[in-house]
């Protein structure tokens, strides 16, 4: 069974983030995430959301370890008093050579020092396999429902073959509602296709960015757009293209959980 989760960007004002976090938890979402650009403090923003909630799982999507190494991640978790028992620590390779080796070393380092769930952000099959055989979870992104389902099947099969517990499988899905947000989605697509890793991902999979997101003219279209995501992965993480205005973001929180 697939559950819904929600993600906010670090650009979301703290007051809005706290309000939305409380609403996400009360509405029954399975987890709450924050992105973590290399030069921003995603963990600090997540701490704001943690303070506004009591039980929901908290995730990072994802901390780039080339910019924020594992020891710095752990220091920031301590500084912000993030509860490790609620933390789903998503990490990504970032930039540089030997990303698989860097991630494998980071998983070992973090697992020895924190009880948090260690989640690997993965675009390609080799990073997914690393997550399947070494991590507690795998976070997919920029995939269609069909690709997400196939990747989840592969991850579970690889974990079973390795004789280890099956990791959680999660997927980020960008969402926009209304003309203004649909325009922002187009801008996000243009940005992603300029990033080498994402450009390679789209070439490899043969999909376009617009095939991987939820683009709704209005909230009434959400049920039909969410339907293909049922029974794909463990959690579909909705990522509003913009949550700066509290009203539309609250409406999305309410409408999506009601539709799923």
Regions found by a protein language model. Give the residues of each.
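Active-site-adjacent structural elements that line small-molecule/cofactor binding pockets in enzymes
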Residues: 1-260
């Amino acid at each position: 069974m697939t559950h819904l989760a929600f993600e906010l960007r670090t650009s979301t004002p703290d007051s809005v983030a706290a309000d939305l976090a409380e609403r996400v938890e009360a509405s029954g979402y399975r987890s709450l995430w924050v992105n973590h650009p290399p030069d921003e403090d995603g963990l600090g923003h997540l701490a704001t959301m943690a303070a506004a909630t009591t039980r929901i799982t908290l995730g990072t999507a994802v901390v780039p370890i080339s910019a924020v190494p594992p020891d710095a991640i752990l220091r920031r978790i301590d500084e912000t008093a993030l509860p490790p028992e609620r933390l789903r620590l998503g990490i990504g390779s970032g930039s540089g050579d030997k990303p698989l080796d860097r991630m494998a070393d980071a998983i070992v380092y973090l697992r020895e020092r924190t009880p948090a769930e260690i989640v690997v952000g993965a675009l390609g099959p080799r990073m997914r396999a690393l997550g399947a055989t070494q991590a507690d979870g795998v976070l997919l992104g920029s995939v269609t429902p069909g690709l997400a389902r196939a990747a989840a099947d592969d991850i579970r099969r690889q974990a079973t073959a390795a004789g280890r517990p099956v990791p959680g499988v999660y997927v980020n899905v960008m969402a926009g509602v209304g003309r203004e947000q649909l325009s922002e989605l187009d801008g996000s697509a243009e940005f992603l296709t300029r990033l080498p890793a994402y450009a390679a991902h789209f070439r490899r999979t043969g999909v376009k960015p617009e095939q991987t997101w939820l683009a709704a003219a209005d909230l009434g279209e959400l049920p039909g757009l969410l339907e293909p995501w049922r029974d794909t992965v463990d959690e579909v993480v909705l990522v509003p293209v913009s949550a700066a205005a509290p009203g539309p973001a609250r409406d999305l929180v309410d409408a999506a959980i009601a539709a799923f």
